[in-house]
Design a protein with these regions (language model features):
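Conserved CoA-thioester-binding segment of acyl-CoA-metabolizing enzymes
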Residues: 1-66, 101
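Terminal low-complexity tails and localization/encapsulation signals of metabolic enzymes
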Residues: 1-14, 256-272
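Glycine- (often His-adjacent) and acidic-residue-rich active-site loop
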Residues: 65-102, 118, 146-148, 230
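Crotonase-fold acyl-CoA enzyme core
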Residues: 101-217, 243, 248-256, 262, ...
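Short, charged, surface-exposed hinge/linker loops at domain edges
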Residues: 224-229
Length: 272
């Protein structure tokens, strides 16, 4: 197993290794509980795709978690600061857009391997992978509604295409938790396996792709992802509305309630 080259040395929240020729494995190395993303990690997962794309030694990328969870999403202590700081809000919005479009436009196929929790931005990283593999008992949730903001980071651009509008609306509007097995059943991910099989299967798929005809493989991804690119205006609108929510009373109340471990009290008189 080889270490990754120096181009990745600046990353402190991501670890890199090469488990197979042409395969770069990116492992989340968050210092927070359950792999939650602090501000630095959020920035790094938005920037890594340009470096991967420029690395001629990489044919395929595996994205995986470090420990019992894939990623529990954003750090709400930081997101509370985002509510009150315009510069932080714009930075977070730009990073969110770069994460989504970076994965879509990265020429190299991405294989996601998730065990444990995948929430918010963590779930985005799995669902946007070209091949998404999770344990059957993994726990997924898009929790935007719970914290009083619109589901805006990745869901509107890809969920209706993968699982249909009915399922997308249900899970995004209720923020209900569901398992990896349920995600496979509704076609949100490629496959769900026993927990101990996930990492090996991800490496098997990535190794197979790395041996494929590179131009044909990349062109196949590129053309299929036109389905997502044509939905980019929908994504931009949802992302903007999400961050309007962060600046409003619902976003503040939702995050405060979560941090204070109490039910949120959303006013039904909030202007819309």
């Amino acid at each position: 197993m080889e270490e990754a080259p120096d181009r990745y040395a600046r990353y402190t929240r991501l670890k890199f290794d090469r488990p197979h020729p042409g395969v770069l494995r990116v492992t989340f190395a968050s210092p927070l509980k359950m792999g939650a993303m602090d501000a630095r990690m959020h920035r790094e997962v938005s920037e890594i795709w340009a470096d991967v794309d420029a690395d001629d030694s990489v044919a395929v990328v595996i994205v995986t978690g470090d420990g019992r969870s894939f990623s529990a999403g954003g750090d709400l202590n930081h997101e509370r600061k985002v509510c009150d700081d315009y510069a932080l809000r714009m930075q977070a919005m730009t990073e969110s857009r770069n994460l989504v479009m970076g994965m879509i436009n990265c020429r190299k196929p991405i294989v996601g391997a998730a065990r444990g929790w995948a929430v918010g931005a963590g779930l985005a990283l799995l669902v946007l992978a070209d091949v998404s593999i999770a344990s059957k008992d993994a726990k997924f949730s898009d929790g935007h509604m719970k914290i009083g903001v619109a589901a805006g980071d990745h869901a509107t651009i890809i969920w209706p295409l993968l699982c249909g509008m009915a399922k997308a609306k249900y899970y995004l509007m209720t923020a209900e938790t569901f398992t990896g097995e349920e995600a496979e059943r509704m076609n949100l991910i490629s496959m769900a396996l026993a927990d101990e099989e996930v990492e090996a299967k991800a490496l098997e798929v990535a190794s197979r792709l790395a041996r494929s005809a590179p131009a044909a493989l990349r062109w196949t991804k590129h053309t299929l992802n036109h389905w997502l690119r044509q939905a980019a205006p929908i994504f931009d609108a949802s992302l903007a509305l999400e961050f309007i929510g962060f600046a409003g009373p619902e976003g503040r109340e939702g995050i405060d309630a979560f941090l204070q471990k109490r039910p949120a009290q959303f006013s039904q008189d909030t202007p819309v």
